[in-house]
Curated annotation (Swiss-Prot):
Changing residue 697 to W: In SWN2; uncertain significance. One of its GO terms (molecular function) is small GTPase binding. One of its GO terms (cellular component) is recycling endosome membrane. Pathway: Protein modification; protein ubiquitination. It is found in: Endomembrane system; Recycling endosome; Golgi apparatus. Changing residue 654 to G: In SWN2; uncertain significance. Pfam families: BTB (PF00651), Kelch_1 (PF01344), Kelch_KLHDC2_KLHL20_DRC7 (PF24681). This is Leucine-zipper-like transcriptional regulator 1. The gene is LZTR1. Its main location: membrane. Residues 443-537, 667-736 form the BTB domain. Changing residue 294 to L: In NS10; uncertain significance. InterPro entries: BTB/POZ_dom, Kelch-typ_b-propeller, Kelch_1, LZTR1/Attractin, SKP1/BTB/POZ_sf.
Amino acid sequence: MAGPGSTGGQIGAAALAGGARSKVAPSVDFDHSCSDSVEYLTLNFGPFETVHRWRRLPPCDEFVGARRSKHTVVAYKDAIYVFGGDNGKTMLNDLLRFDVKDCSWCRAFTTGTPPAPRYHHSAVVYGSSMFVFGGYTGDIYSNSNLKNKNDLFEYKFATGQWTEWKIEGRLPVARSAHGATVYSDKLWIFAGYDGNARLNDMWTIGLQDRELTCWEEVAQSGEIPPSCCNFPVAVCRDKMFVFSGQSGAKITNNLFQFEFKDKTWTRIPTEHLLRGSPPPPQRRYGHTMVAFDRHLYVFGGAADNTLPNELHCYDVDFQTWEVVQPSSDSEVGGAEVPERACASEEVPTLTYEERVGFKKSRDVFGLDFGTTSAKQPTQPASELPSGRLFHAAAVISDAMYIFGGTVDNNIRSGEMYRFQFSCYPKCTLHEDYGRLWESRQFCDVEFVLGEKEECVQGHVAIVTARSRWLRRKITQARERLAQKLEQEAAPVPREAPGVAAGGARPPLLHVAIREAEARPFEVLMQFLYTDKIKYPRKGHVEDVLLIMDVYKLALSFQLCRLEQLCRQYIEASVDLQNVLVVCESAARLQLSQLKEHCLNFVVKESHFNQVIMMKEFERLSSPLIVEIVRRKQQPPPRTPLDQPVDIGTSLIQDMKAYLEGAGAEFCDITLLLDGHPRPAHKAILAARSSYFEAMFRSFMPEDGQVNISIGEMVPSRQAFESMLRYIYYGEVNMPPEDSLYLFAAPYYYGFYNNRLQAYCKQNLEMNVTVQNVLQILEAADKTQALDMKRHCLHIIVHQFTKVSKLPTLRSLSQQLLLDIIDSLASHISDKQCAELGADI
């Protein structure tokens, strides 16, 4: 950790050099042994593939392999292998190979006896082999010999040898349309269809030694998914995920995760209303799901008699869904090579409008880094895959490949599509503020709660940014304290609010809140810092009652976002065992909406008889019993139409407003940039930066002022504001010239990952234009970023006619003008030599 006054953390910029064909920023770890100077920054100037771009690759010709669905695909090295499926008339057992480098199809070499023709089987890769399990076999044309299988075959990629594994002992029931994955040297099989019913059992088998292995049934626990088939599974963060699928009347759009370690299932709750994010995908079957980085990507399937073609993305860390917006060049077709843009080929350098159209996605912001235009295809066609089901997907490197499937009118497809992922280090904003809350460092306010006068400490900056009600309370307490100090003739120093004489920590501000108890108030405070609460045990009466108390506080404090979260949790937790307790508590707390939910739950036909026979029912208050009986006798009230839900503001939105002026009166530290003061908030700086945390803990300046630099370099005021935006609310969008100043900031200031640096690097690689090249040249010269300076001079030389008309050119330093002249002279000399050589 970099201490105050030191040269700061150090960076390994060369290690950050990403692939030359993708805008995917690498998630690299800190290397504190390297130089923190951008002098050693290595950049890749293209060509790039646009993130979130769909490309249509060459389809599989009929003479190589039939169009198909219900097949499997796996990825091995630089190839996609397709096995089995059906072409609408017959089942298949051929093995096709697609080379992603040269975009060529062929039949894979095979020896031995392959599996019988089949579909709805599973295929996984382990080591240098592919394993095929189960599926449906027989003659679909004559409708004979149709049966499910439970056989296991191995295909060795190196030799092309097919081998059937003969397993002794218990076997899984024969099945098709199941899920399969590999984890910890084992094949895991879940659910499927056995010909009579859907399943939800799980089996596993070791793949290291077929002579010693056997099938084992897994004893699952927790919230096991319902019996289902035609669903995908994916492994991410050492967990297996299952989304939707065919479950008869029980079909849902729930996402389940399986912990391999303790064999436990959990249904993941959705909080899209709370987070202001899109809802989960519709319930569906026949779709695909793959994992990349910390995300799950769901595509296609049949969703309530439709075939949607949106790509849905689930963030495993933040538990949110979103619809991925394809890049604009996906929609207008590929430039130059719509069917041959594979890994081995050079992607043409496009202008900004042609390449990204400034259609900004969540993970990328892009401007032009190219200087030449590519010819437009004569007949542009959409590169987006149409909706389909029973297709298959696999991941190679940083891209997803989708092949085949059933499209409109039950037509089989032979198309191959490629989707470019994006990958950036995750935003740690919520975690950083949560860490501040847990540590209780630098607390400057103490809330005195309830009749017991229990105390909970916090930070004025966070609380006043998130809650107007608590902000008023804190303001009133400060005014009372100021009046008291004035009466005692001891005014608070004005030049450094929040800093006591000699740099000592000022006394805590005491705020009394009589209507709140400590435990629910702590849950509320956790929400203010993180935008979420740690999920209690679902259905446990004590936890449900606690969240009801939190809900009551959220209503009193006008925290709409917390209201929605509490309601979602409580309504999802109500069951036959706790409904009466929850209903009685809701009536006592005057929580009318929750009370209505409980009453409607009780009077359901399938619940009522069980509820009234419980002992808890006998102990209910008479008015509540009467209300339940009357509710049962009368038709339930008509449900009003859905009203817009006020989800309030998020942590990011509140901290943005706080930095932009809403928190001005609560500033308690002054940052000096080249002598210019910028008021700020200690708690926020300490939460996001180990540099400031160490300073405020052990080296607090006596005058409450901190000089700002990054190593020996003083950033521009614009770059400094960009850094503050990142610190306060995680903003990474900034002008490219700011990125040169801030590239080393994550190491010097001890940010908790390299997200800012990854975006700075991408920004520099992609966002230099003729319009901003001179500003970036100045920044590169000041920061001694030699690689970027050379690139800027290269652009200036090749676009000098346009650059010469920019007013900024006349304000450059003499030395930079001489550098431009030298580069022009060198370019002209090289050009003349080339022309002379051509003449000779």
